[in-house]
Amino acid sequence: MKAFTQHNGLVAPLDRANVDTDQIIPKQFLKSIKRTGFGPNLFDEWRYLDVGQPYQDNSKRPLNHDFVLNNARYQGASVLLARENFGCGSSREHAPWALEEYGFCAIIAPSYADIFFNNSFKNGLLPIILAEDDVDQLFKQVEASPGYQLRIDLQAQTVTRPDGEVLSFEIDAFRKHCLLNGLDDIGLTLMDADAIASFEGKHRASQPWLFRD
């Protein structure tokens, strides 16, 4: 997993509350357990005017030009600004996969659904919680200022606006450590590879009848 330390990124405002995981990545695209291939279908039912299907050539599909990610001023956005209860609905790890593959490194919202929140950290996507008043102000500034960027400093736990205003956010110390060091569950396990190998060796020696060579 790629480490997250600091990030300067263009902000895309998704001004909708209670965005659920089926809206983030619709169910028909969940047939793969690979982590790649979901970005082109992020928010599929909002980005396109037709019904998308797996492995379809999206370049030939009609775009919904009223949707924020189809607006030229937000092309290349890497920070998603959202409303409360983002990521609600069914549990699917494909949701943070799709957001990350599209190009988002962080999300800013007043609140998240618990499962989505946890899945985001496990996949290197930083979900930042800010007060609703601060989020409201960010929406106003983003919509009024083309090219609006934020600076996110995970070590300092701050979001800095273009006007220099600094917003602080809280994050669990363990999750922060994992993101700063690029550690997912597999990476954490591999840190104890020597201890695991030592245990397996002792276990095999003490109870050889449990193993078949």
From Swiss-Prot:
HAMAP family: LeuD_type1
UniProt name for this protein: 3-isopropylmalate dehydratase small subunit
GO molecular function: 3-isopropylmalate dehydratase activity
Pfam families given in the database record: Aconitase_C
Family membership noted in the UniProt record: Belongs to the LeuD family. LeuD type 1 subfamily.
Record's keyword annotation contains Lyase: yes
GO cellular component term of the entry, any: 3-isopropylmalate dehydratase complex
Metabolic or biological pathway, per its Swiss-Prot or TrEMBL entry: Amino-acid biosynthesis; L-leucine biosynthesis; L-leucine from 3-methyl-2-oxobutanoate: step 2/4
Complexes and interactors: Heterodimer of LeuC and LeuD.
UniProt cross-references to Gene3D superfamilies, sorted A to Z: Aconitase, domain 4 (3.20.19.10)
Catalysed reaction equations from the record: (2R,3S)-3-isopropylmalate = (2S)-2-isopropylmalate
Top EC class for this record: lyase
Chain's gene name: leuD
EC number(s) from the headed UniProt entry: 4.2.1.33
